Amino acid sequence: MQEMVGYLIKYPNVLREVMEGNACLLGVDKDQSECIINGFKGLEIYSMLDWKY
């Protein structure tokens, strides 16, 4: 799962699509996918995916 999180950080456009429900994470089950998405939502990411400090 750590590799998937790293990939989503590297490619924020993919993260955006996954969070909007327009894409899914291959090889990741629904529970893991929801966990990853909720983790990013918990970081208070702006709509342009700039990190909020």
Curated annotation (Swiss-Prot):
Its main location: secreted. It comes from the Bacteria. The DNA sequences encoding ComQ, ComX and the N-terminal two-thirds of ComP show a striking polymorphism, which determines the specificity of the quorum-sensing system in the different pherotypes of Bacillus. In ComX, the sole conserved residue is the modified tryptophan essential for the activity. Part of a major quorum-sensing system that regulates the development of genetic competence. Acts through the activation of the two-component regulatory system ComP/ComA composed of a sensor histidine kinase, ComP, and a response regulator, ComA. Interacts directly with the sensor histidine kinase ComP and stimulates its activity. Trp-51 is modified by geranylation, which is essential for activity. Modified by the tryptophan prenyltransferase ComQ before export to the extracellular environment. The type of isoprenyl derivative differs among the different pherotypes and depends on ComX primary sequence. Coiled coil: none annotated. This is ComX pheromone. GO terms for cellular component: extracellular region. It is found in: Secreted.
